[in-house]
Amino acid sequence: MDVPAALNRAAHERKANRKLVSRLRDRPPKDLDYRFHQLHEEAFRDIDCLECANCCKTTSPIFRDIDIDRLSRHLGMRPAELVERYLHLDAEGDYVLNVAPCPFLGPDNYCSVYEARPRACREYPHTDRKNMLGILSLTLRNTLVCPAVARIMRRLR
């Protein structure tokens, strides 16, 4: 997969995706979640996250307290040490990574803390969740990060 080309295409489709989000909010189809879930399954049959890892390279997940506790145990350090070394509070008051790419991302695009990764990483790109209508703004933003999300939105149009 040509990740830069896919993301460039998504950037050019931004206006069309905004119109789609507006239309879905104004007239949400009853089967919106089902449609997203079907397109999610289809996209990830073809797209291998390990060939991309753009989410890990460019964005930070939100770390909840439970994520911090789980990851600190996995790394054999105190939660306060994990926060001090890897995290900071963002403008919304959420813990996020200090740096991008993620310090736990290997050169082979594998996550060195995969079993202990935050919930936000486990659920990304969030296109198989319930109540997709409630996260359309997030989904729109994710079209510029994840080629699979861009493809899902393109197919929804």
Indicate residue ranges for each PLM-predicted region.
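Short loop/turn segments that flank or connect secondary-structure elements
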Residues: M1-R157
